């Protein structure tokens, strides 16, 4: 009889080992691959760390370099301002010539403009009521006087009445300097102290002004509708020949004469004038007597200038007593000669009173 497998004792006895099977080979190969992959990963990680360290150092160096460059640029900007706009081109000969030509044209335009302005101001100085052969008004004074003159004329046209000379001059001299005011007053034959009392606080208040002592009469000029002399249409030297009517001072001179004064008929303009005389600030002009007047009124007696100074000079004239000749001056003839000014008439009245005493 045959033995069974269990009985043969195979279960208890070790079996001899045979050659490795294909599964073992597969497992061993997989383990090797895993180990190789791990090594490669470790190498890659080490290389990556080394690369990162290297790159980090380079980046830090680059950052430091950039910071240093920025600091240097900021320092340069602080030292030198940054120029804006187009860069300066190189100056060539052609550009220099064009530049000089443009500059010459601009200078010529400015010169012509100033010449035209000065010519217009000269024409304006001839029109405004202020004339002087020795003094020239400044530009600002000329413009101010012209503005006041236009304002005064517009007020006259608006009111339609003949203006008062004092108020007219006050309007003209508003805002002007004292020298210009004196020139305007001299051209209109007025004393600036009479119509500008507020500028002279030392002037006594009891002294009357020109408008209070002598009635102001408007002058009659050839130009109709204008209250001031026609400075633009007439020669400036003729302005000073204009005289007020003789009856303007008759009320003030009547106490010096025995009979009332009569009006004198004479032309509005007289002959040539001698240089002006200044009496108490008033501008008056001495007329040169003609040859006929010298023949008709030739005085044979010559009196010293001190005879008009005071009463102590009277003895030198009348020292001979009753034997001295009495000289009477024909007042009517003198008053009929209209070339005498106000102060000359007063002097003749005083002489007549002395001779009649």
Swiss-Prot record:
Record's compositionally biased regions (Acidic residues): 58-78
Regions that span the bilayer: none
Residues modified as Phosphoserine: 162, 259, 266, 274, 336
Expressed in which tissues: Expressed in pancreatic beta cells, pulmonary neuroendocrine cells and retinal interneurons amacrine cells (at protein level). Expressed in endocrine cells of the pancreas. Expressed in the inner layer of cerebellar external granular layer (EGL). Expressed in the Ammon's horn (AH), which includes the CA1-CA3 pyramidal layer and in granule cells of the dentate gyrus (DG). Expressed in photoreceptors of the outer nuclear layer (ONL), in a subset of cells in the lower half of the inner nuclear layer (INL), and in a subset of cells in the ganglion cell layer (GCL) of the retina.
Region named Disordered: 1-94
Domain of life of the native organism: Eukaryota
Gene inactivation effect: Mice are deaf and die shortly after birth due to neonatal diabetes that results from developmental and functional defects of the pancreatic endocrine cells. Show a loss of enteroendocrine cells in the small intestine, airway and alveolar epithelial cells in the lung, granular neuronal cells in the cerebellum, hippocampal dentate gyrus and sensory neurons in the inner ear due to extensive cell death that occurs during the early stages of differentiation.
Keyword presence, Phosphoprotein: yes
Entry's localization field: Cytoplasm; Nucleus
Gene Ontology BP, a term: inner ear development
Principal localisation: cytoplasm
Protein role: Acts as a transcriptional activator: mediates transcriptional activation by binding to E box-containing promoter consensus core sequences 5'-CANNTG-3'. Associates with the p300/CBP transcription coactivator complex to stimulate transcription of the secretin gene as well as the gene encoding the cyclin-dependent kinase inhibitor CDKN1A.
Protein name in the entry: Neurogenic differentiation factor 1
Taxonomic classification: Eukaryota, Metazoa, Chordata, Craniata, Vertebrata
């Amino acid at each position: 009889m045959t033995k069974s497998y269990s009985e043969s004792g195979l279960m208890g006895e070790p079996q001899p080992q045979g050659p490795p099977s294909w599964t073992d080979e597969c497992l061993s190969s997989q383990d090797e691959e895993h180990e190789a992959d791990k090594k490669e990963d470790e190498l890659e990680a080490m290389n990556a760390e080394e690369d990162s360290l290297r790159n980090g150092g380079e980046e830090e160096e680059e950052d430091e370099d950039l910071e240093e460059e920025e600091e240097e640029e900021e320092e340069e900007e602080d030292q030198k301002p940054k120029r804006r706009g187009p860069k300066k081109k190189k100056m060539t000969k052609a550009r220099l010539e064009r530049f000089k030509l443009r500059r010459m044209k601009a200078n010529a335009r400015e010169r012509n403009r100033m010449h035209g302005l000065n010519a217009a101001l000269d024409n304006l100085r001839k029109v405004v009521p202020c004339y002087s052969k020795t003094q020239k008004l400044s530009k600002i004074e000329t413009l101010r006087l012209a503005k006041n003159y236009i304002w005064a004329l517009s007020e006259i046209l608006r009111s339609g009445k003949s203006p008062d000379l004092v108020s007219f001059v006050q309007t003209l001299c508003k805002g002007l300097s004292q020298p210009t005011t004196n020139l305007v007053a001299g051209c209109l034959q007025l004393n600036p102290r009479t119509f500008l009392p507020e500028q002279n606080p030392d002037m006594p208040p009891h002294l009357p002004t020109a408008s209070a002592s002598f009635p102001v009469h408007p002058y009659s000029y050839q130009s109709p509708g204008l209250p001031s002399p026609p400075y633009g249409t007439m020669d400036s030297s003729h302005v000073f020949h204009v005289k007020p009517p003789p009856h303007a001072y008759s009320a003030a001179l009547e106490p010096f004469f025995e009979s009332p004064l009569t009006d004198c008929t004479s032309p509005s303009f007289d002959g040539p004038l001698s240089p002006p005389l200044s009496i108490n600030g008033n501008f008056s002009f001495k007329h040169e007597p003609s040859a006929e007047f010298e023949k008709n009124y030739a005085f044979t007696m010559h009196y010293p200038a001190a005879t008009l100074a005071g009463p102590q000079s009277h003895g030198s004239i009348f020292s001979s007593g009753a034997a001295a000749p009495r000289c009477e001056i024909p007042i009517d003839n003198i008053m009929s000669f209209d070339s005498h000014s106000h102060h000359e008439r007063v002097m003749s009245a005083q002489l007549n009173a002395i001779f009649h005493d």
